[in-house]
From Swiss-Prot:
Keywords: ATP-binding, Cytoplasm, Kinase, Nucleotide-binding, Transferase. PROSITE patterns: GUANYLATE_KINASE_1 (PS00856), GUANYLATE_KINASE_2 (PS50052). InterPro entries: GK/Ca_channel_bsu, Guanylate_kin-like_dom, Guanylate_kinase, Guanylate_kinase_CS, P-loop_NTPase. Its EC number is 2.7.4.8. It catalyses: GMP + ATP = GDP + ADP. This is Guanylate kinase. ATP binds at S16, P17, S18, G19, G20, G21, K22, T23. It comes from Ehrlichia canis (strain Jake). Residues 9-188 form the Guanylate kinase-like domain. GO terms for cellular component: cytosol. The keyword NADP does not apply. One of its GO terms (molecular function) is guanylate kinase activity. The keyword Metal-binding does not apply.
Amino acid sequence: MNDNLKSSGIMLVISSPSGGGKTTISHLLIDELQNDLVRSVSVTTREPRDGEVNGKDYFFVTEHEFINLCNTDQMLEYAKVFGNYYGIPRKFVMDNITTGVSVLFSIDWQGAFKLIDIMREHVVSVFILPPSMEELRRRLYNRSGKSDIVKKRLGEAAFEIDHCYRYDYVIVNHDVEESVHQIKCIFTSERLRVQRRILLKQFIDNYIK
């Protein structure tokens, strides 16, 4: 890409029902777009687990520090889960996208909708569907082996899938490599949008002189 016509980063939001392939696809995207895409790092008040690194897995803070971040508008969104706070730090996201690096969010539809509502101009959202509900049933059964859990997960999946209409793109994950390829195409084209071209006016003014 011409150094005089760079693009800002995007907030790439990926969702799918459990067993839809979201996690695998996200890992592959990070591996293949490593110079242009980073995984979102959340802030949390929970204690670090063995092997977790501050600033890589999470930003670990006290509850007092977390509340202060919220009160000073430094969190894009946050929630309390099982007694611990989790949130998306505004500075981490904006520092990346303003320098041309995109941020990947592998989240459920509720988190996706929150980001769409507050950061619409930066968000590109993709919902991943399993090849079929029968295939999803097979995957879930292979994971748990318990029919009652599978039945519950399938019900949850149908509810989640019903929210796909608000996403920018919907992909049926017949093949992981093909799904990754499709999302990489989306990624490239979205970063080439006029509104994401940094210093475009200056570039054009010099171009037509």
